Amino acid sequence: MTTIPLRDTRLAYLEQGRGEPLVFVHGTLGSMRDFPGQVGFFSQSHRVIAYSRRFHPPNPADRSGDSYSLSVHAADLAEMIEALGIAPATVIGSSYGGFVALCCAIRHPGFIQRLVLGEPPMLPLLKKTHEGEIALEEFEANALAPARAALAAGDDTLGVRKFFDGVSGRRGTFDLLPAPSREKLLESAGALRLELRAGTDDYMPAIPDDQIHSTLVPVLLLNGQKSPRMFSLITDELERLLPDTYRVLIPGAGHAMHAANPAFYNGVVKEFLAPD
């Protein structure tokens, strides 16, 4: 593990391999350790970098006055790419990491040459359809609100359980995980608390359609076959708005598709990365 200094913090990252750079960006309950099935595979042909976003382990979880901001995470990604001298890079984002990656491509053009987005939870896009609005209301009621309340009360396990079950789409999913997996998720409880107490405009802003449409880099959109319908609805809107997309369904996988079916996931991404 190495750390890199940014404008007001240091971020931990790991690096392996040589060649064209690939940057992996993890989701809400994650860290740079989320991609073991990808780092070894892609480092055979690429320079692979996986980093822990601000507030996520092993980085400090919280500092007084900090806010969980999409803009800050996107700026961190751009600054990291610049500091490592790897612009323009291919960025592979899982869940909220995909939201961060797309925001970086929009607000920091020239840093990213290709995007792989695995179900970015761009919740404002759900408001564009009646079905999406219903899905958003259910997710807020069944996952976000109870997780927020539990974390505010200091019950990290209940908060993480409610959130994880919500993004998995099945109650009881968290409790079925092996103990080491549950412990790893609980390490990010502080980051989840910070995210859910942030203002919506900070951590979940609505990106204007014209800004999404102006993203000219090629984008691979991925969905898990077993993921909640909500994520497919969001990807439908991204497919409609982005000018250069390729969409694939990962069989037998849920929201954490890179972990559930790494062989298929890696093959699809490898094909996307292949020269034309």
Which residue ranges define each predicted feature?
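Conserved hydrolase catalytic core segment
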Residues: A87-L126, H130
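A catalytic-pocket lid/entrance helix-loop region that shapes and gates access to the active site
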Residues: G118-A152
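Conserved HGGG/HGGXW glycine-rich cap/lid loop of the alpha/beta-hydrolase fold
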Residues: P5-D66, M80
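Conserved acidic catalytic loop of the alpha/beta-hydrolase fold
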Residues: S71-A89
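Catalytic histidine-centered segment of alpha/beta-hydrolase-like enzymes
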Residues: I250-N266
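Conserved serine/cysteine hydrolase catalytic core
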Residues: P178, E183-R240, Y246-L249
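Short beta-to-alpha linker loops that shape the active-site pocket of alpha/beta-hydrolase fold enzymes
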Residues: S52-H56, P121, A253-G254
